[in-house]
Amino acid sequence: MSRSLGLLIPLFAVGLLSLSLFIFWVLKSDQINLAVGANRFAECRTSNAFGGSNIGGEFELLNQAGQVVTDKDIFKEPTILYFGYTFCPDICPLDVYRNSEAVELLEAKKISATPVFVSIDPERDTPEVIDDFVKYHHPKMIGLTGSKDQVKHISKAYKTYYKAQQSNDDLYLVDHSTLTYLILPEYGFVEFFRRDKSAEEIANITACFVRNS
């Protein structure tokens, strides 16, 4: 029994060492990939978005046709992603219009991009409501909604904030963050845009990321 144990201990030690080396290699590879990505896009970046591997992730939602879609279905080309709600009286329409204009400017640069609108008001924003909204703003726009849990999941993944105001009717407002996100299929989240960025600036910055990807 003791002899068998004596043979197992070295084998266990070798296995533990191999596992440790593998974990080190994985972590080191991630660090290298992040560094390469940071250097690759250094000339394009206007925000403090490095470390973007912590932003974004997998999700499952409904599109404007009521179909179940995932992040892999949505992010097939450069994507300009925005979180808002269709009943928003002022900020959302302006931001969504600007993002749609940026997509048009990118098209003039021979760059295809997709504008995506994620609702943070799933109770009112059904697929039918979302469909009318996105058709009004841009023919390529994808609208996403879902259950409360699904919306909460993607909001948490992208570090967004939203909170519906207390109301006794359906005319309530929703407080929410207003960042726009740039997603590249090969890299995920790479940059964000604040409200003070113009459509021209968003298009130029996006084009820089695409050229360097």
Where are these regions (language model features)?
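Short, small/polar residue-rich loop motifs at catalytic or cofactor-binding pockets
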Residues: N54-G56, P78, D175-S177
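Short, acidic, Ser/Thr-enriched surface-loop or helix-capping motifs
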Residues: N63-Q64, L184
